[in-house]
Amino acid sequence: MSNMSNMSNNETEPKGTVTVVTAYYCVKSKHDPSQYDMWINNLLLRVGQNCKMVIFTSPDLVEYMNAVCKKNDLGASFTVISMEIKEFKLLKRYPLKMWVQQYAMDPQKSCGRTIECYLIWNSKLMFVKEAMKRNIYGSDKYVWVDIGSCRAPGDSMSNESNELEHFPRYENVSNDDKVDIVLLRPYAAEEMNQVIFYNTVHLSGAMFGGNTRAINRLYELFYKALDVYLCGNCFAGCDQQVLSTCCVHNPEIFNLIIPDSKKGDVWFYLYHHWS
């Protein structure tokens, strides 16, 4: 489904486009479906013409997602792609029994996260890669955003401009073969050669992106690192630890963004940085 905007009559020189990639699967997690419904509406109804979005979801949610997309009146473009969890390439590479083992060692399972959460989190780069392969919008830059990352209600911005209406600005997404990602907590000196990160968070995996070369490089590094975690029987259900391994061993491909806590939730600071 596409909700395509009209071409502007005062376009100047052509420039590239950014495809925003996200996914939603109604699985047991820390938050219930009604909470996600609010967050999904917060995001999809506030993005404008700059936003060309690809949304992966389960077959039973395609109609719901298309209905939300149709309510956007700011000129954003959407493509909803049906894909069952059992079709994930991640499961072809790492069978379900490996994720059952991962759940048994999860230090935070009590918060409500599940095997399905692990599969979705560790498939983010596979979703982006699939969107790049289809290249629906002819983009040379791609960014990932968690579907539940726009948590402030729309009316909270009623007295100021809607920052998301211009999200993402092409020129604000890195074009130097680096991946933009938020650094939540600096790495200690002794962590710079660390291979396995456990139950620590340094990077926000909720949002990241860059040009296609940067994404391809991160894709390669991420799944090599995930191999190390899983083959070593180390917990890797949460993608943020695997991203840390990639970062400390390949710092040259990351553009680490220091968030300003005055600009909202630091986990989702790239909404501000890219707008």
Task: Specify the residue positions occupied by each region the protein language model found.
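Catalytic core and acceptor-binding pocket of nucleotide-sugar-dependent glycosyltransferases
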Residues: 149-151, 155, 187, 194-275
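Short, acidic, metal-binding catalytic loop of nucleotide-sugar glycosyltransferases
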Residues: 39-51
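N-proximal low-complexity "stem/linker" segments adjacent to membrane-targeting elements
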Residues: 1-35
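Non-transmembrane, aqueous-exposed alpha-helical and coiled segments at domain scale
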Residues: 126, 182-186, 243
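GT-A fold catalytic core of metal-dependent nucleotide-sugar glycosyltransferases
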Residues: 116, 121-178
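Short, aromatic/basic amphipathic alpha-helical patches
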Residues: 62-76, 94-96, 247
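Short beta-strand-to-loop element that shapes/binds the nucleotide-sugar donor at the catalytic cleft/hinge
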Residues: 177-191
